[in-house]
Amino acid sequence: MKPAHTFSLIFSLLFVINPCYSATLPLAIRRELTWGQVNILHTTDIHGWLAGHARDKRYSGDLGDFASFVQHMKHLAKQKDVDLLLVDTGDLHDGTGLSDLTDPPGSWTDSLLANMDYDILVAGNHELYLSTVANDTYHNFIPLWEGRYLAANIDIYDEHVSSFVPFGDRYAIFSTPHNVKILAFGFVNSFSGATDTVRVLPVSQFSLQPWWNDMVSNKDIDLILIPAHVPVHNASELDIVLSELRIHFPTTPIQVLGGHSHIRDYAIYDEKAVGIESGRYCETVGWVSINGIPSFKSLVKLSGISSLMGVESYLAERLRFIGESIRRSSQQIFSSLQSAKSASVSFSRSYIDWNPEGFMFHSKTKKSSFNTSLGEFISNGIYEARKALGLLTPIGCSPKKFAFSEVPFNDSNSIYHLFQSELFPKIVVNESRHHIPHYIIVNSGGIRGGLNSGAFGLDEVFQVCPFKSNIFYVLKDVPWSITKYLPQALQHSGYLIAEDTLQINTPQVSDAKFEDFYEHSIRKTYGYTTHDDLGDDGDDTAHLTTPHYEPLRFICSQVGFDDSFSGDDKQVVDVVAPSFVIPRLDDILNKIADKPLYSPDDWELYFTRPDGKHSMTDLLPLYADLYWDHDCLYK
């Protein structure tokens, strides 16, 4: 199933990569995409990053650049006489000021995304945490897609009918221009923490639902798409769905399009079922192609050689190349084509770095012709929205780069270390109880990105920590006989996954040196070097492997444990945490005590400010204002 790739070298402008690495790249080395009968561009876990990564050339494209790319690729697909679909698999919200500063959060970014020509979309868990976001998505965003926004296991309370109703369509059946009949069936991962107006239904109960029986009764399906907000590996929900579908569609090709764990990944389930996951934060565009679908029909009349890529065109070209094909009759050629149509299905995948240079390379366009009117409209809309939200105005000056995962958790250059050693002890302060030794505990998934050196604004603040609803509570006077075991117990308690923790977001990297891909003398940027079930050749751009260190599961600041603290078991300490972590902490403390001592009702508000700036998101600008120079604001 592993496709043969055509390798290509192209020259690009010299640019400086992320300042963490201080390296330059004189040449961008890119792999060509493999086209098939059905091709899919895939996005996932965008999290509001529609403006792209302006300070990182590897992922510098905005949504407007992507829109232009999609339009050019659709034109290219038409030239090649093949199908091209566009699919997104959820988590459009929570992650940037552009997304999170509007009321309701994500309403402006949803309006911009509505300009995209998506064929299928599904919800992620971040569409479902807040009732305002869920209701806005249900009432104003989902109807725009006319039955192509899928939510097999999500119900929402509709106040107009006073009952729970499907959040989106359970499934969709449609045919492509080339006569491929597709069943698309999408769902979200099982998670806790959804707003009270939303119900996430167990995937294990799908086969008991009336709509499931209606869906699987369609036997003339040529291709099954499973766009789902789940990882493509080690997801029990996906295992259940694949097993159930294979009962009814034992030989139908299945393409899974996953998400949630923020990595590039590809999985092979059986000889006709595969899955791709396409990263996060507008860093990656996934690409899959599928060949060997018998129902596929060329839109160009067969004349010895038809379309540029399909099975018919490939076989016709081979017949022309081989001498004996010249002597074959048209009937023999037709027979050969029919035989090819019954051959086994094949798949390929690529991971495209989200930048204009790569988009131009793959769409065979130039800078002068790349931007489309739609792309420029969206880019202008992003700029105006950022301007209106105050995102273009710097509010602080970072003295250096604080890395997210490129350095160890406790390194002084780590964003986690900054929060643990500086922000929590110095900003999260309750004057009436600050003298009492206390822990400040946050799940590390509450930190979602690093911070570059120099000026930063509200957009960067939300990129580091977008959880505006995370405010701090205290559990008072907990005996040291219990709390002395708490730091160790936290790290052995498992990941707190409901808030989409990023401990599972590691790119699956390899030490492959790509000797067969480029000359050793050519320099590369740091970036994704993905190893998946198809090997090491999926990344469209050759990179050096980015250093990656897993964070601890929880950030735990110990404050006030000075020489006066004796460590006697009868001493008491306070435990401070945001509301999201409280149920986990209660569970851990009760297990240490071996009895049910604590519940959420025992926690009291700890850190408040008259100006309302007391959430996790507010800590960074508050700290910067007090402890960092402001010189960059006046340059």
From Swiss-Prot:
One Pfam family cited in the UniProt record for this chain: NadN_nucleosid_C
Domain of life: Eukaryota
Compartments reported by the entry: Cytoplasm
One MF annotation (Gene Ontology) recorded for this entry: 5'-nucleotidase activity
Signal peptide segment: none
Cytoplasm as UniProt keyword: yes
Family: Belongs to the 5'-nucleotidase family.
Stated name of the protein: Uncharacterized protein C17G6.03
